[in-house]
């Protein structure tokens, strides 16, 4: 557990509380910090809160890089457990670490006086269960629909467990005071609880100009010729991301536009595509680069060398945070035509295609052949991101949300 400065205690409602109030208690069942979806989103939230002067205590897993922000204290649960990495998605390790959050959470609410609790994902469940003891308002950060995320799991995808998960989700949505969800999930939330106070996250995209030497070095490092077209995917390789669909599409693209290189960044399991015929053929042709997860700062350089950015994601109700980065990069985007993608994309900012390799491949070929059309799409996406997805509007949204939490 993270060490923190001891403060004098007094009594309120029969519980000991600190004489010094911390505004917000954040409970995050995540490895914080790591360069992947939800931890990146959480860091954005914490940075915005810090900039606006909020004091925040974060209860989280023992896994992750240290983060220092003004007003932030981190309390790591389960540090004594022999767990040093947490895979994406459901795992026994994550369940064990979820339970380890409970005693640290209880100690926090007995040691400090908070104005409200901000709980991510499944942490909202035990925060609500224990409400009779803390009586604090809850903002539920619904990064995804848990039943949808686990639909492909061999056990939790079974109908009996899906019904149970949907019951838990429905209960949390209806009991939370406010809900903030990933872009594209609002409609799902309102279908469960029509009167819910729900807001969607629209995260800021970042853009950095790179010197020619930096991009040339990356191309050389990846073994990509200067005149080769580059199609880039970033993110995890879980089944719902549609990476297999992209690999199938890539075969069509390489046949139509020889020399095209597909770069997939975020691979954590080198053997994941060992049985993929498409991956094997692309490797034989020298058209595929599988790259391990990269620091966020380096991802921008990967986007700088790309000619097309792709998101072949299934319709699971929420948008991948990479879309905001894609839009900030100003490169043409090909994405599956799902409600979550349409939360920020339309035909003026991307090519949206059905969930077939043929449609995705055709759109990529079109952009590789018509660079002027690609530039128009990329410029439009970047312009939209600059106007609507900037850091200031995001930080203002955090301030508004937290002001509501204080009421």
Feature locations, PLM:
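N-terminal subdomain of nucleotide-sugar transferases
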Residues: 2-65, 253-255
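A short helix/loop element that forms part of the nucleotide-sugar donor recognition site in Leloir-type
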Residues: 12, 210-224
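Conserved donor-binding/catalytic core segment of Leloir-type glycosyltransferases
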Residues: 25-27, 181, 225-241, 247-250
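Membrane-proximal helix-turn-helix segments that form the acceptor-binding/catalytic region
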Residues: 44, 103-110, 125, 132-133, ...
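Donor nucleotide-sugar binding/catalytic pocket of nucleotide-sugar-dependent glycosyltransferases
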Residues: 60, 75-76, 159-213
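Nucleotide-activated donor-binding/catalytic signature segment of Leloir-type glycosyltransferases, i.e.
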Residues: 266, 274-300
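Acidic donor-binding loop of glycosyltransferase active sites
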Residues: 301-318, 331
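Conserved acidic donor-binding segment of nucleotide-sugar-dependent glycosyltransferases
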Residues: 347-358, 366-372
């Amino acid at each position: 557990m993270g060490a923190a400065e001891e403060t004098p205690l007094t009594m309120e409602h029969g519980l000991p509380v600190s004489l010094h109030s911390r505004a917000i208690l954040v409970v995050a069942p995540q490895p914080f910090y790591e360069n992947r979806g939800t931890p990146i989103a959480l860091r954005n939230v914490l940075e915005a809160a810090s900039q606006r002067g909020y004091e925040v205590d974060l209860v989280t897993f023992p896994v992750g890089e240290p983060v220092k922000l003004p007003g932030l204290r981190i309390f790591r649960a389960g540090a004594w457990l022999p767990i040093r990495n947490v895979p994406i998605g459901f795992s026994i390790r994550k369940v064990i670490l979820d339970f380890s959050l409970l005693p640290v959470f209880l100690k926090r609410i007995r040691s400090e006086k908070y104005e409200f609790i901000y709980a991510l994902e499944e942490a909202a469940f035990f925060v609500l269960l224990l409400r009779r003891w803390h009586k604090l308002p809850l903002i539920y950060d619904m990064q995804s629909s848990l039943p949808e995320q686990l639909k492909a799991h061999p056990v939790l995808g079974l109908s009996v467990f899906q019904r149970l998960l949907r019951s838990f989700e429905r209960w949390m949505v209806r009991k939370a005071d406010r809900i903030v969800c990933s872009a594209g999930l609002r409609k799902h939330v309102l279908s469960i609880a029509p009167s819910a106070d729900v807001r969607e996250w629209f995260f800021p995209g970042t853009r950095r100009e790179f010197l020619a030497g930096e991009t040339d070095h990356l191309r050389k490092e990846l073994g990509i010729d200067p005149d080769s077209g580059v199609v880039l995917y970033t993110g995890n390789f879980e089944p719902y991301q549609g990476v297999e669909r992209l690999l199938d599409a890539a075969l069509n693209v390489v046949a139509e536009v020889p020399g095209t290189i597909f770069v997939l960044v975020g691979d954590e399991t080198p053997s994941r595509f060992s049985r993929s015929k498409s991956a094997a053929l692309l490797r034989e042709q020298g058209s595929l680069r599988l790259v391990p997860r990269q620091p966020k700062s380096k991802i921008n350089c990967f986007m700088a060398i790309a000619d097309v950015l792709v998101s072949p994601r299934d319709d699971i109700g929420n948008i991948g945070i990479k879309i905001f980065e894609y839009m900030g990069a100003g490169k043409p985007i090909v994405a599956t035509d799902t409600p979550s993608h349409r939360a920020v994309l339309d035909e003026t900012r991307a090519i949206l295609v059905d969930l077939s390799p043929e449609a995705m491949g055709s759109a990529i070929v079109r952009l590789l052949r018509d660079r002027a059309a690609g530039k128009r799409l990329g410029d439009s996406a970047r312009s939209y991101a600059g106007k609507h997805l900037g850091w200031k509007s995001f930080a203002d949204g955090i301030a508004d949300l937290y002001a509501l939490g204080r009421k």
